[in-house]
Swiss-Prot record:
The gene is rplU. Part of the 50S ribosomal subunit. Contacts protein L20. This protein binds to 23S rRNA in the presence of protein L20. One of its GO terms (cellular component) is cytoplasm. The keyword Ribonucleoprotein applies. This is Large ribosomal subunit protein bL21. Disulfide bonds: none annotated. One of its GO terms (biological process) is translation. InterPro entries: bL21-like, bL21-like_sf, Ribosomal_bL21, Ribosomal_bL21_CS. The keyword Ribosomal protein applies. PANTHER family: 50S RIBOSOMAL PROTEIN L21 (PTHR21349), LARGE RIBOSOMAL SUBUNIT PROTEIN BL21M (PTHR21349:SF0). It holds the Pfam family Ribosomal_L21p. It comes from Pectobacterium carotovorum subsp. carotovorum (strain PC1). GO terms for molecular function: rRNA binding; structural constituent of ribosome.
């Protein structure tokens, strides 16, 4: 059984017991979270597709950890003009473990 849901402007395909990295959620580590924007649920040959969301579809998960990703370097450069700027960015994320899928 697997499902596709929406969180943080992105879509994720998950199955029960899987750990997924999402955009940062303001929920403490160890707490439960429920996603109701379920786009599709598949159970063997039976597939439910939402318009845009599946009626009664819910994904239950537990927050495992919060953190920051790898640093992305941003460079602005103009040749022959002695101009160079550097910046960096590290995106916050939340790891969640899927505990249940229902539709």
């Amino acid at each position: 059984m697997y499902a596709v849901f929406q969180s943080g402007g992105k879509q994720h395909r998950v199955s029960e017991g899987q750990t997924v990295r999402l955009e940062k959620l303001d929920i403490a580590t160890g707490e439960a979270v429920e996603f109701d924007q379920v786009l599709m649920v598949a159970n063997g040959e039976e597939i439910k597709i939402g318009v845009p969301f599946v009626d009664g579809g819910k994904i239950k998960a537990e927050v495992v950890a919060h953190g920051r990703g790898e640093k992305v370097k941003i460079v602005k450069f103009r040749r022959r003009k002695h101009y160079r700027k550097q910046a960096g960015h590290r995106q916050w994320f939340t790891d969640v473990k899927i505990t249940g899928i229902s539709a």
